[in-house]
């Protein structure tokens, strides 16, 4: 459960990211594919080469979903219900992949915003991404 301090840290960080969320989402997704090659299996129809427009576009979708989540921190399950259905029933993404992408998102954000990436912010973002991952995998059961 996100504490009030966590929610403040997440919202504040997301505000600082601003218009770069899509760019960072693409970078994090590319980092995930490079660092964890098994994640590529869900994207056989994508050009997965560095700088791929398809990877950038999907990264923007990831960032848009996270932006939606940031706007609904008190109702993540409701806000992400359709995405949870999609990933559980249609795409059948292995839940571990959400953890891998979350890690790569943290690395990407730390690279771009080192001064703001304090231990408290790191912990809050980690809890946020973990909570989002839990919501996205909740319909697997």
From Swiss-Prot:
<dbReference type="GO" id="GO:0019825">
    <property type="term" value="F:oxygen binding"/>
</dbReference>
<feature type="modified residue" description="Phosphothreonine">
    <location>
        <position position="137"/>
    </location>
</feature>
<feature type="modified residue" description="Phosphoserine">
    <location>
        <position position="49"/>
    </location>
</feature>
<feature type="modified residue" description="Phosphothreonine">
    <location>
        <position position="134"/>
    </location>
</feature>
<dbReference type="InterPro" id="IPR009050">
    <property type="entry name" value="Globin-like_sf"/>
</dbReference>
<keyword id="KW-0479">Metal-binding</keyword>
<dbReference type="InterPro" id="IPR050056">
    <property type="entry name" value="Hemoglobin_oxygen_transport"/>
</dbReference>
<feature type="modified residue" description="N6-acetyllysine; alternate">
    <location>
        <position position="16"/>
    </location>
</feature>
<keyword id="KW-0813">Transport</keyword>
<dbReference type="InterPro" id="IPR012292">
    <property type="entry name" value="Globin/Proto"/>
</dbReference>
<dbReference type="GO" id="GO:0043177">
    <property type="term" value="F:organic acid binding"/>
</dbReference>
<feature type="modified residue" description="Phosphoserine">
    <location>
        <position position="102"/>
    </location>
</feature>
<dbReference type="InterPro" id="IPR002339">
    <property type="entry name" value="Hemoglobin_pi"/>
</dbReference>
<feature type="modified residue" description="N6-succinyllysine">
    <location>
        <position position="40"/>
    </location>
</feature>
<dbReference type="InterPro" id="IPR000971">
    <property type="entry name" value="Globin"/>
</dbReference>
<feature type="domain" description="Globin">
    <location>
        <begin position="1"/>
        <end position="141"/>
    </location>
</feature>
<comment type="similarity">
    <text>Belongs to the globin family.</text>
</comment>
<dbReference type="GO" id="GO:0005344">
    <property type="term" value="F:oxygen carrier activity"/>
</dbReference>
<dbReference type="GO" id="GO:0031720">
    <property type="term" value="F:haptoglobin binding"/>
</dbReference>
<keyword id="KW-0597">Phosphoprotein</keyword>
<dbReference type="Pfam" id="PF00042">
    <property type="entry name" value="Globin"/>
</dbReference>
<feature type="binding site">
    <location>
        <position position="58"/>
    </location>
    <ligand>
        <name>O2</name>
    </ligand>
</feature>
<keyword id="KW-0007">Acetylation</keyword>
<dbReference type="GO" id="GO:0042744">
    <property type="term" value="P:hydrogen peroxide catabolic process"/>
</dbReference>
<feature type="modified residue" description="Phosphoserine">
    <location>
        <position position="35"/>
    </location>
</feature>
<feature type="modified residue" description="N6-succinyllysine">
    <location>
        <position position="7"/>
    </location>
</feature>
<dbReference type="GO" id="GO:0005506">
    <property type="term" value="F:iron ion binding"/>
</dbReference>
<feature type="modified residue" description="Phosphothreonine">
    <location>
        <position position="108"/>
    </location>
</feature>
<feature type="modified residue" description="N6-succinyllysine">
    <location>
        <position position="11"/>
    </location>
</feature>
<keyword id="KW-0349">Heme</keyword>
<keyword id="KW-0408">Iron</keyword>
<dbReference type="GO" id="GO:0072562">
    <property type="term" value="C:blood microparticle"/>
</dbReference>
<dbReference type="GO" id="GO:0020037">
    <property type="term" value="F:heme binding"/>
</dbReference>
<feature type="modified residue" description="Phosphoserine">
    <location>
        <position position="138"/>
    </location>
</feature>
<feature type="modified residue" description="N6-succinyllysine; alternate">
    <location>
        <position position="16"/>
    </location>
</feature>
<dbReference type="GO" id="GO:0004601">
    <property type="term" value="F:peroxidase activity"/>
</dbReference>
<protein>
    <recommendedName>
        <fullName>Hemoglobin subunit alpha</fullName>
    </recommendedName>
</protein>
<dbReference type="GO" id="GO:0031838">
    <property type="term" value="C:haptoglobin-hemoglobin complex"/>
</dbReference>
<feature type="binding site" description="proximal binding residue">
    <location>
        <position position="87"/>
    </location>
    <ligand>
        <name>heme b</name>
    </ligand>
</feature>
<feature type="modified residue" description="Phosphoserine">
    <location>
        <position position="3"/>
    </location>
</feature>
<dbReference type="InterPro" id="IPR002338">
    <property type="entry name" value="Hemoglobin_a-typ"/>
</dbReference>
<feature type="modified residue" description="Phosphoserine">
    <location>
        <position position="124"/>
    </location>
</feature>
